[in-house]
Amino acid sequence: MIKLFNSLTNKKEPFVPIEEGKVKMYCCGPTVYNYIHIGNARPPIVYDMVRRYLTYRGYDVTFVSNFTDVDDKIIRAANELGEEVAAVAERFIKAYYADTCALNVKEADLHPRVTETMDDIIAFIADLEKKGFAYEAGGDVYFRTRKFNGYGKLSGQALDDLQSGARIEVDERKEDPLDFVLWKAAKPNEISWSSPWGEGRPGWHIECSAMIKKSLGDTIDIHAGGKDLTFPHHENEIAQSEALTGKKLANYWMHNGFVNINNEKMSKSLGNFVLAHDIIQQYSPEVVRFFMLTAHYRTPINFSDELLKGAEAGLERLKNTVANLQHRLAETADMGAEEEWLEKIAGAKQRFIEEMDDDFNSANAISVLFDLAKEANIYMSEAQTSKKVLNAFLELFAEFGEVLGVSFTQQEEELLDAEIEALIEERNVARKERNFARADEIRDLLKEKNIVLEDTPQGVRWKRGS
C-alpha cells in the first residue's frame, strides 16, 4: 500500500482515495511573468513522477495544474516591456511548456487559467460574502480570517501568534489585520473585470480555490506544491474553500523541498537563480530530471555543476548497461530460463515498488536501479546467457524508466550497434592491409564514443564503457 507524508497531519498515512481506483490531484502552477528557473522546475518534475507512479500502480489519475496569468508581477513585467498583459502571459506559458516538455513532464489533464475562470472566481467570492465570510471595503473584498474555525491547521500557526506585517498584508480598511484580499479594486490603466464590487481583479489565493472547485469538485485527493506555498497560500485556500463548502479541500497535502544554491533557496527575488532553459542547454534535460529525482522530494537539494556531473555519469552508467544488454541479446542463442536470475530481477522490482510506496522515495528507488545494473553486468560476464533473462532485465529498466520519466536507452546521437560493427569491420580490414594509422583512428573514434574494444583469439569483442 502506498503511504505518503501528509503535510496536514505532519505524518505518513496510507493513501486511500475518495473513489476507489481514481485520484484527483491538483498542483499549483506558475505565475507566468518570466522563464522558470531550476527551483520552479522541481514541482513539475516531482509531481509528474508521483502521477506516473500512481498510474503505474493502477490508479486513474486526473491531474490539474493551473496558470496564474494575471498578477501584480505580470502587470509590472508588461508595463516594463510595453506589452499587453495577455501577450506577456502567453509568451511565458509557451516557454513553460517548452521547458517542461524538454524535461519529459507530461501535460496536465487540465491547465486552467485565471483569466478563463473569472466568472467562477467572482461567484465564489459572492457566495463567501453571502455566508458572512467576506466583506467589501472601498472596492476591495476581504476574507474574515477569524471567522473560519481551524485557520492555521496546515501551517501549524495559531491566529493569536500571527503578527500583522511581514507576510500579512496591512491595510487600514481591513476589519482585522489578518484578513486577506479576495478581490482587488482596479487601479488606473490596469487590466480589470466587472464584478458586483466594481471593476477589479482577484487576489492570488482565491484563484486556486475556484479553479479546483470548477475542475475537480469540492474535495480532492491530493493537493501539491512547493514548501514555500504552505503559508499563506495553501492555508488561505483551505480557509476559503472549506468556509464555502463545509468540506475538506484536500485529504492529502504534499510539499516539495527547495532547490538551493550554496544552501540558500533559489529564487528570483534573491537573484541567485539559474533558468531551466539555460541549464538544459548545458546538460541534457533528462540529466536535469534524473538529478532532481536522486533526492527525496521533501528534502532540499543543492544545485551545483559537480552534482549535475555526478548525475550525468550515473545516468550514463545505466544507459551503457542497457545498451550492453541489448547488444548481448542480439548475439545470444535462445536458452532456457535461469530461475535464479529471474528471481533476482523480480526481487529488484519488488524493492523498487516498496521504496516508491514509501512516500514516493525516488532516491532509494534509483539505488535499486544501480543494484539492478550491477546484477545485469555480473550476468553478462557469464559465458552463456539466456534471452529470457536479458529481456527480463531490459523490461524492468523500461518499467522503472517510465515511472521516473527517464529513458535508459541510447540516444540518437549515440552510435547504433550496426554502426559500431561496421566500424570494427573497417578496422579489421585496415589492420589486414597494414593500414595501422586508420585502424588506430577508428579505435580512438570508438573510444571517444565510450566503446571499449577487446582483441581476443576469437575476434574483436566490444562493449559500452561504464
Swiss-Prot record:
Subunit record text: Monomer.
NCBIfam families, A to Z: cysS
Q: List the disulfide bonds.
A: none
Cofactor detail note: Binds 1 zinc ion per subunit.
Organism taxonomic ancestry: Bacteria, Bacillati, Bacillota, Bacilli, Bacillales
Whichever gene encodes this chain, its name is cysS
Q: Does the keyword rRNA processing apply?
A: no
**This protein is called what?**
Cysteine--tRNA ligase
The record ties this protein, via SMART domains, to:
DALR_2
Q: Which UniProt keywords apply?
A: Aminoacyl-tRNA synthetase, ATP-binding, Cytoplasm, Ligase, Metal-binding, Nucleotide-binding, Phosphoprotein, Protein biosynthesis, Zinc
Record's subcellular location: Cytoplasm
